[in-house]
Amino acid sequence: ITKYKHEIMWWMSRLTIMVTSLFLSMTLAAQAYAAEIQMGSGGNLVFEPNEVTIDAGETVTFINNALPPHNIIFDKFASLSRESLMFTPGETQDIKFATAGDYSFKCAPHEGAGMKGVIHVK
């Protein structure tokens, strides 16, 4: 019976480690992801939502919803820009914002149609 008790304890310790690891990884992933912005939402040339507020260090995911091509241009923060055109619906770009401030962005091909937005970083 001691052998079985030892084996059960071994499996329980492994299960505890796995569950704890899973919980921690989910918590860390949730902390890093702050907002999702759709591009071309509802068949319109818009960012949806076109304004979000996040904390410094968080990431915004841009998703090409439809009506390609789209890109993401930050006029005052060129290093954050994603100038390459996104053609495939479902294609994503993740952008991390390390510093507090207001980050205005646009889609260069559709700026004239009003495809603009702002990310407020606290």
Q: Which ranges hold each PLM region?
A:
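A subset of signal/propeptide-processing and intrinsically disordered low-complexity segments
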Residues: I1-T2, A66
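Bacterial N-terminal signal peptides that target proteins for export
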Residues: Y4-V19
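Bacterial N-terminal signal peptides
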Residues: M18-T27
